[in-house]
């Protein structure tokens, strides 16, 4: 008798053919997957390189910005000092003057004061002289309150000028303020 039952562990010819076809179909799929993987790895390497370049460029920009700020501070002080040199020259000339002419010395001091004021203004240092203005605790320091005809809390007199630099108070003005009636 002939055995018509097939052994389940032995592949049939049909199974072998389908496995060959599957293997042949899998080969291009594997090649495609390998190609896609290689392409993805190349893209990752490219992006990593781009990231490192961008990071280095950002660091360079940050360093250049710090250098620029440092130079700006240095040269701002240099410019301010240059504006003060004529004041120094005038004071030295006054000290060396032996004429004894009080009017001439006073004229020289007034000129020196104008030079100093000009130098400070070029450095954006501006005097606060608030007579008649409403008292502002950010710009004024009240020394006393006095009875006055002016509106209450108005600056009556300035004992010492205050100064600002670029809208920032260097020194508040020392003032006397009108007392409420």
Curated annotation (Swiss-Prot):
What Pfam families does the annotation carry?
Answer: GrpE
Q: Name one GO biological process term.
A: protein folding
What PROSITE patterns has UniProt attached to this entry?
GRPE
Q: Residue ranges of region Disordered?
A: 1-33
Give yes or no: UniProt keyword Membrane. Answer: no
User: What spans are recorded as compositionally biased (Polar residues)?
Assistant: 1-12
Biased composition annotated in UniProt, kind: Low complexity: 21-33
GO cellular component annotations, sorted alphabetically? cytosol
Q: Which domain of life is it from?
A: Bacteria
What keywords sit in the KW lines? Answer: Chaperone, Cytoplasm, Stress response
Has keyword Chaperone?
Answer: yes
* Compartment(s): Cytoplasm
Chief site of localization = cytoplasm
InterPro entries attached to this UniProt entry? GrpE (IPR000740), GrpE_coiled_coil (IPR013805), GrpE_head (IPR009012)
What are the recorded GO MF terms, alphabetically? adenyl-nucleotide exchange factor activity; protein homodimerization activity; protein-folding chaperone binding; unfolded protein binding
Which family, according to UniProt? Belongs to the GrpE family.
**Oligomeric and partner information:** Homodimer.
Its biological purpose: Participates actively in the response to hyperosmotic and heat shock by preventing the aggregation of stress-denatured proteins, in association with DnaK and GrpE. It is the nucleotide exchange factor for DnaK and may function as a thermosensor. Unfolded proteins bind initially to DnaJ; upon interaction with the DnaJ-bound protein, DnaK hydrolyzes its bound ATP, resulting in the formation of a stable complex. GrpE releases ADP from DnaK; ATP binding to DnaK triggers the release of the substrate protein, thus completing the reaction cycle.
User: PANTHER family, per this entry?
Assistant: GRPE PROTEIN, GRPE PROTEIN HOMOLOG, MITOCHONDRIAL
> Protein name, please?
Protein GrpE
Give the lineage. Bacteria, Pseudomonadati, Pseudomonadota, Betaproteobacteria, Burkholderiales
Q: Which gene encodes it?
A: grpE
């Amino acid at each position: 008798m002939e055995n018509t039952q097939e052994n389940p562990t032995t592949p049939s010819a049909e199974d072998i053919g389908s496995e060959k076809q599957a293997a042949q179909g899998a080969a291009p799929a594997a090649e495609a997957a390998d190609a896609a993987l290689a392409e993805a790895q190349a893209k990752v390497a490219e992006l990593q390189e781009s990231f490192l370049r961008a990071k280095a460029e950002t660091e360079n920009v940050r360093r250049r910005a710090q250098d620029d700020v440092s130079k700006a501070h240095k040269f701002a002080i240099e410019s301010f000092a240059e504006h003060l040199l004529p004041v120094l020259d005038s004071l030295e000339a006054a000290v060396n003057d032996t004429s004894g002419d009080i009017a001439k010395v006073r004229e020289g001091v007034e000129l020196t004061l104008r030079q100093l004021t000009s130098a400070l203004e070029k450095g954006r240092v501006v005097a606060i002289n608030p007579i008649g203005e409403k008292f502002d605790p950010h710009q004024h320091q009240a020394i006393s309150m006095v009875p006055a005809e002016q509106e209450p809390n108005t600056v009556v007199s300035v004992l010492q000028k205050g100064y600002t630099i670029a809208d920032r108070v260097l020194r508040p003005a020392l003032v006397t303020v009108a007392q409420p009636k």
